[in-house]
């Protein structure tokens, strides 16, 4: 893990390969990504070897099989390294480019004292038992706020991932997307779906959030161990339209929590919406391509 309270196992790799890095002004330079190498690495044999076989489990609710509505836009982040394990969770968020994920900042950037942005990340939506039903998606660019990149400020532990097209399609065209909130509340009935790094399938729990602080939310449900960082907190989910609103992602205080039964999230306020606008506009930091 990245630290005592981290929900993610991060290895920041200093490998320079071609990608366009999209960063916030003042943010640490992004680490480039190699889409061809990453795709070649994740063949089916490696996916099956990454984790032991088993079945998904649902906390305090009904099981959601692969491809179920609640988990449709959620996937595991894998890093191109020898360990072969997924390390975080991410989900599709609506954007004009139809190519955007939301996750925890600490999943994609080491923050203060770290090595900057992660390299060779791939996203596998609906991952289960070594299967990638919607393909393996490579990363175009990563984005976190400078308050995270420079100071590891827990109130800015949210990041965005822009994906490359896959087979001529964008991720939102394939899976749909949830949206960001327009209000700034503390209490929401949410579905939280994520990938523990010791399992080969997601877990899901439904519960009501509460206020941890003026800038943080809290969610109580068991089983959210390492690997669940970045898991979306989805409210107002419609099984008919298969859409909902993301009001949080596991991260923030204690990088999401140091106990698997209590999780935290940054409250998705103006700072996150500003970061989102920079992600969808393709703005870059001074000196970046």
Q: Where are each of the predicted segments found?
A:
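Secretory targeting and sorting signals
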Residues: 1-31
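Cytochrome P450 catalytic-core helices
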Residues: 103
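C-terminal cap/linker of serine protease catalytic domains
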Residues: 247, 253-289
């Amino acid at each position: 893990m990245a630290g005592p309270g981290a929900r993610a196992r991060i290895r920041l790799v200093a490998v320079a390969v071609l990608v366009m890095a999209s960063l916030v002004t003042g943010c640490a330079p992004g680490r480039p990504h190699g889409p061809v190498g990453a795709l070649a690495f994740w063949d089916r044999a490696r996916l099956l070897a990454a984790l032991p076989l088993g079945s998904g489990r649902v906390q305090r609710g009904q099981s959601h099989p692969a491809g179920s509505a609640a988990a449709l836009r959620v996937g595991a982040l894998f890093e191109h390294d020898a360990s072969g394990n997924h390390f975080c969770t991410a989900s599709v968020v609506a954007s004009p480019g139809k190519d955007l994920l939301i996750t925890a900042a600490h999943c994609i950037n080491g923050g203060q004292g770290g090595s900057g942005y992660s390299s060779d990340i791939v996203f596998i939506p609906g991952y289960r038992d070594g299967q990638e039903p919607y393909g393996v998606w490579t990363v175009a660019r990563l984005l976190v706020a400078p308050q995270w990149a420079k100071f590891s400020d827990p109130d800015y532990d949210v990041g965005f991932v822009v994906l490359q097209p896959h087979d001529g399609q964008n991720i939102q065209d394939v899976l749909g997307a949830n949206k960001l909130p327009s209000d700034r509340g503390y209490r929401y009935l949410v579905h939280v779906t994520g990938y523990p790094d010791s399992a080969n399938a997601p877990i899901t729990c439904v519960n009501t959030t509460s206020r941890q602080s003026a800038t943080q939310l809290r969610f109580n449900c068991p089983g959210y161990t390492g690997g669940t960082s970045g898991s979306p907190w989805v409210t107002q989910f419609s099984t008919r339209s298969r859409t909902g609103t993301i009001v949080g992602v596991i991260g923030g205080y204690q990088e999401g929590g140091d106990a698997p039964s209590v999780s935290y999230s940054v409250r998705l306020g103006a700072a996150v919406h500003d970061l989102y606008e920079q992600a969808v506009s393709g703005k870059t930091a001074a000196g970046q391509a």
